[in-house]
Structure formats: structure tokens, C-alpha cells
Amino acid sequence: MSEPLKPRIDFAEPLKEEPTSAFKAQQTFSEAESHTFAPAAIDERPEDEGVAEAAVDAALRPKRSLWRKMVMGGLALFGASVVGQGVQWTMNAWQTQDWVALGGCAAGALIVGAGVGSVVTEWWRLWRLRQRAHERDEARELLHSHSVVKGRAFCEKLAQQAGIDQSHPALQRWYAAIHETQNDREIVGLYAHLVQPVLDAQARREISRFAAESTLMIAVSPLALVDMAFIAWRNLRLINRIATLYGIELGYYSRLRLFRLVLLNIAFAGASELVREVGMDWMSQDLAARLSTRAAQGIGAGLLTARLGIKAMELCRPLPWADNDKPRLGDFRRQLIGQLKETLQKSKSSPEK
């Protein structure tokens, strides 16, 4: 028998691609492997929080307007005129031997010198606060860099700014872990895992202490005015303590600027997270039914203080947050509730005795 004829093949038309199946191949897992599965981490951050963070960054950038330049130029011209007039008065008083006027000129020079010195000091501290944001950006770049140029010097500068002595155990472990073949990303990563947690742990303890004090003070104090003054004073002290831990010396204007940055950051980016975390805890545990109104207000004040401390910690920290390193309100919430319940139980048991 003759073989059947084959169909015609037309090479003028393009080749047709065979459709591929969208299904993945079957995978079989053993019973032992099934116990090692972990649920996928779901990012609970709302979608609009990224937009809020961008709005914060745009709001915190200094705006160099024409009016500001004109005001600064006018102040510089006025200062030069005052100095020139003072020099002229001093020369005239010396030539005429007017010792009273000469003493007044000397006193004025001392006052002006003290004012200029304080302005320069405030400017330097404010500049250091602004430089911390640039250092954080530089650290973020180094954590993605494969060069071997600036990593070690950058980390040593951070340790010196934070007041960490060369004989500190954490710094000694970091020196022992690094070697010449490591790149900047590995060196800065080792610093972030070995040295930076020492400062972060101290900052967390300060936040816990100040938040607990705010909670207990609001819970037991009957005067709202005293509560407001106490909370404002303790929050400023908390910001100063955190800035000092991270090697930033705050002046008057730099303290106001940091406080403003923290409040702006909370207002833009922290409202949704605060409402979500506090609301979930209060609704799930029904704290309003268990605790008194003053106790609930104390917990709210303590959580706001903790939120303030977390944001101050984020702005003063020289390194960006790594995975799961950023403190959350939940870390402090359970501690505050436990301390408040313990205090209330002690106060109830003391009259019975």
C-alpha cells in the first residue's frame, strides 16, 4: 500500500506559537515539610499612607523663597551697620577720652558677641539636625552599594557621634566581624545588626518609661490643666533624651524644629496606624468596660507619648529601619495595659488592708 500524502506546508506564513498552559506543575510536600510552612506576611499599611509619607517629605523640605532671601539680606546689612556704628562710637570715645561712653561700648560689644555666639551655636545645632536626614540617605545608599570605599569610615563616624567608646563590646564585635573583602553594604549591615541595636534598646526603654509615667499620671490626676502641662513637659523631655542618645545636641530652635517634624509626621502618616492599632486593641479586649474613664484616658495619653517617641526615634536615627526593626505601638500597648491594671489592683487592695 502507498503511504498517505502529507499536508502542505506553507513557509510564507509566520509560525504559530503553541499555547502554553497557565497552570503550574503539581508539587507534592511531605507531612514533615507541612509543619514548617508560615503564613505570608500581609502588609497592613493602608495604601494612602505612602502618599501621606510623600506629603510629609515635601512639607519638611526647606523652601528657599525670594522673601526669605530678602529678609536674610536685610538682617545681614543691619548687623553690619550695627558693627560699623559701634566701631565708630568706640573710636570717638577713645579719641575724646569719654570713659563712660567707652564702657558702654564695651558692654554693648559683650552683649552683641554673646548674641552672635548663641546664634552661631543654634545654627550649628540646627544644621546637625538637618544633616542627620542626609546621613540617613547616605546610609540607605551604602546599604545597596557594592563598593569598598566609605562603609567603615561612615560607621566609625556614627559611633563617634553617638558617644560609643572604642572599647564598647558591641563595637569590638563589629570590628571583629568585618574584614577587607567585605563591601559597604555588608559593613553597614553588620553595624546595623551589632552596634545600632544598643542605642535602639536604650531609646525603647526611655519611650516605655515616659509612656508609663504619662499613663499613670493621667489615670490618677483629677486636674486636666495639670495633665496637659505634665504631658507637654514629659514629651519635650522625651525628645531631648532620644536626641541625646543618638548624638544630636538640641538647641532652642532645633528642639522646636524637631518637635514640629514629629508632630507633622504623626499628623500625616501616623493617624491611620494609630486609629487601627488602638481601635483593634480596645474593641477586642473591651477596655472601656473593664477600666474607668480616667484609666482609658491614661492609656490614650501613654500611647500618644509612645507614638511621639517612636517618631522622634525615627527622625534622630542615623540608619534607616531594617525589616521588623521598627518599634510598633503594640510593643508598648500591652506593657502600658499591664502596668495600669497592676496599679489599679494595688490601689483597690490598699484601702481593704
UniProtKB/Swiss-Prot annotation:
Source organism of the structure: Salmonella typhi
Transmembrane domains' residue ranges: 70-90, 100-120, 213-233
Cellular component GO terms held in the UniProt record: plasma membrane
Sequence ranges of Basic and acidic residues compositional bias: 1-19
UniProt subcellular location: Cell inner membrane
Membrane topology: Multi-pass membrane protein
Keyword line: Cell inner membrane, Cell membrane, Membrane, Transmembrane, Transmembrane helix
InterPro entries in alphabetical order: DUF697, UPF0283
UniProt-listed NCBIfam families: hyp_HI0043
Pfam families with a match to the protein in the record: DUF697
PANTHER family, alphabetized: UPF0283 MEMBRANE PROTEIN YCJF
Periplasmic side: 1-69, 121-212
Name this polypeptide is given: UPF0283 membrane protein YcjF
Membrane topology (Cytoplasmic): 91-99, 234-353
Region feature (Disordered): 1-48
4Fe-4S recorded as keyword: no
Sequence similarity: Belongs to the UPF0283 family.
Classification of source organism: Bacteria, Pseudomonadati, Pseudomonadota, Gammaproteobacteria, Enterobacterales
UniProt keyword Kinase, yes or no: no
